[in-house]
């Protein structure tokens, strides 16, 4: 399936404290030479998504260096390419990204210039393996406007650090609360 990938890699993290003082969470080293963003980019490549935009922002220097120096994901510009975007300050806009929706809005021109019928938006700081084609197949089968991948948190974990999702019997979202002080469920956006 033809889709464009968007990787959100601009956030800072108070829960990572000293580890994120000098680098973006997506640039955190894992198992030596890998960075956390490598998992998301590998998922994109393995799902045959050939055009990927990475939205960076906070402490992005080491992340940008990693993205610019690595050819591991095989995003050749002839097939699509890997594009890195940072917030652009103009006389009309002097803001950093003010969240996920604003990051998309500030880069809407990139999406409009793309011809892929679907967009896969993923976080750059998750360590997981996912076939986005299966998500797209589910999305198309359900004739959904959008699809959110969720997971159930372990009872011992604190879900209030995530977006809490409530769904009906058909899996349709009935409520979403971003990082609530007191979580009312264990199902979180992945």
Regions from the language model: what does each represent?
Residues 1-190:
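Unchanged
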């Amino acid at each position: 399936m033809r889709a464009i990938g968007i990787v959100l890699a601009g956030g800072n993290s108070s829960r990572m404290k000293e580890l994120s003082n000098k680098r973006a969470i997506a640039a955190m080293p894992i198992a030596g030479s890998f960075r956390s963003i490598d998992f998301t980019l590998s998922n994109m490549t393995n799902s045959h998504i050939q055009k990927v935009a990475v939205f960076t922002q906070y402490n992005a220097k080491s992340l940008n260096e990693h993205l610019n120096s690595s050819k591991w994901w095989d995003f050749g510009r002839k097939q699509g390419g890997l594009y890195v975007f940072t917030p652009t300050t103009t006389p009309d806009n002097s803001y950093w990204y003010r969240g996920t929706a604003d990051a998309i809005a500030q880069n809407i021109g990139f999406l409009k210039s793309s011809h892929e019928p679907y967009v896969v938006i993923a976080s750059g700081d998750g360590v997981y393996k996912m076939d986005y084609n299966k998500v797209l197949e589910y999305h198309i089968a359900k004739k959904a406007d959008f699809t959110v991948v969720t997971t159930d948190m372990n009872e011992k974990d604190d879900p209030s650090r995530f977006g809490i999702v409530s769904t009906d019997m058909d899996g349709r979202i009935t409520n979403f609360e971003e990082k609530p002080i007191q979580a009312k469920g264990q199902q979180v956006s992945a």
